[in-house]
Amino acid sequence: MTRERRVLLIDDDQDLADLYLKHLRRDGIPLEHARTGQEADTFVRNRVPALILVDLTLPDLDGRELIERWADDSVSGAIPIWIVSNITPEDNLWWHTAPNVQRYFLKSKVVLSRLSLEIRATLGLPYGDRVSHRLAG
């Protein structure tokens, strides 16, 4: 299965997800959203995103369970994962040993314009004038 050049956001907080969707899509990042762990697992197995942004606290499966499940699969285990959570990284030291987890962001510290630039760099997406103009202004 071919990996799509899109990002999957997994978060049950709809208001936060709407904010991410609006900002990142406006910057030209192809972003999809899953509200539950089961919805995310189905998406990953059928669509294979290029990057996953996952919260650790979900209503059905927690983010860690998803990360561990995907790590054992040859296809999903190759997808880079960035944790975006309100739980501090120091309270979750296990993520350092998870083979597909590359980054850990504390939700309260996320700056969406910076996240957008980092996603673009990771996916090899071009930087648009709109993005650089907004950062300069």
Region spans (language model):
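Alpha4 helix (beta4-alpha4-beta5 surface) of REC/receiver domains from two-component response regulators
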Residues: 65, 87-117
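Non-catalytic signal-transmission and effector/linker regions of two-component phosphorelay proteins
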Residues: 1-8, 112-137
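Active-site residues of response regulator receiver
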Residues: 55
